[in-house]
A protein has these predicted regions:
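Conserved, compact domain cores that house catalytic/ligand-binding motifs in diverse enzymes
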Residues: 22-98
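Structural motif
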Residues: 25, 58, 130-132, 162-164, ...
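Short acidic, glycine-rich surface-loop motifs adjacent to enzyme active sites
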Residues: 63-66, 156-175
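Histidine-centered catalytic micro-motifs
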Residues: 32, 164-171, 195-205
Length: 287
């Protein structure tokens, strides 16, 4: 509740992640910077998912909220349209933010109450069993970020059951070339056996085959996403080795729905019309 100049807002609330390992759901999506009408439709779709499934607890955004990160009027419009994600009873989904390449300047840090120098990358614990590590593909991958990443992964694995990472530019893209961070990040992902990597930026849909050491491996990591929260969708290249023979690509506005249980992580691409484009299950790793 907010109160200012004698005016009082309606009451809002959110739900925290369960501490006892109970099932819950996380929504992920990126690239809402353009296509404002479709951005609004996707916000309503997310709200509908949270209304129909009370286990949806939070929304992880993969970056590129707006076109120009230094323009407050664009942020103001994004924030206003984001209110469509509020449920009728006042429940809101906390945002776990990622910085995109269009989100330059300091307004991003002000909007999400992050320290400019220390919160470009951060870890969010969702209960005791799920950790989401957020990285910044706009900052150098080596040096402080790589050191921080390895320290986090070493601390979290095998302590948590599910270990996820999110960042903006893909390591195994379906449209563009790979992020320059791939030679630094991917070996650490492999070393500490993360479960899934959530990507944006390509404006398409993608699920790779499981990858380890730069090749297909059943023990490897699946990279999913590429961003469909409003932007026009691009045509992906389905002939890349990490997509053929078990992966999948497409073009449609979407979010990625992640359903966590003690034994399985169910990953679904949900389209604007509520249909599922892909439905994939990852089993918990044994240590």
């Amino acid at each position: 509740v907010m109160e200012s100049d004698g005016e009082r807002s309606r009451e809002f609330y959110f739900r925290t992640a369960p501490i006892d390992g109970t099932d819950f759901t996380l929504i992920h999506g990126g690239d809402s910077r353009s296509g404002h009408a479709n951005r609004c439709r996707m916000n309503l779709r997310i709200a509908e998912q949270a209304t129909s499934n009370p286990k949806v607890l939070a929304f992880a955004h993969g970056g590129d909220y707006i076109v120009s990160g230094s323009k407050w009027e664009q942020w103001r419009l994004w924030l206003s349209q984001h209110e469509l994600m509020t449920l009728e009873d006042g429940r809101v989904l906390p945002i776990i933010p990622t910085k995109g390449n269009h989100d330059g300047g300091n307004i991003y840090f002000e909007v999400f109450d992050l320290e400019v120098e220390t919160k470009r990358w951060h870890t969010t614990m969702l209960g005791k069993d799920v950790a989401l590590v957020t990285l910044d593909t706009n900052s150098p991958g080596g040096g402080p970020q790589a050191e921080w990443l390895e320290a986090q992964l070493k601390r979290l694995r095998p302590a948590v059951r599910w270990l996820l990472v999110q960042y903006h530019r893909p390591m195994y893209p379906a449209v563009k070339g790979p992020a320059k961070h791939a030679p630094i990040f991917c070996p650490l992902f492999d070393k500490y056996n993360i479960d899934i990597a959530l990507e944006s930026d390509g404006h398409c849909m993608k699920r790779t085959v499981p990858i380890r050491d730069g090749k297909k491996d059943p023990t490897g990591i699946i990279y999913v996403g590429e961003g469909g929260l409003g932007v026009g969708q691009r045509k992906p290249d389905g002939n890349r080795w990490y997509i053929k023979d078990g992966g999948k690509t497409g073009s449609a506005h979407h979010v990625v729905r992640l359903d966590f249980t003690p034994d399985n992580l169910r990953v679904r691409f949900v389209l604007m019309d509520a249909s599922a484009w892909d439905d994939h299950t990852i089993k918990a790793r044994k240590f």
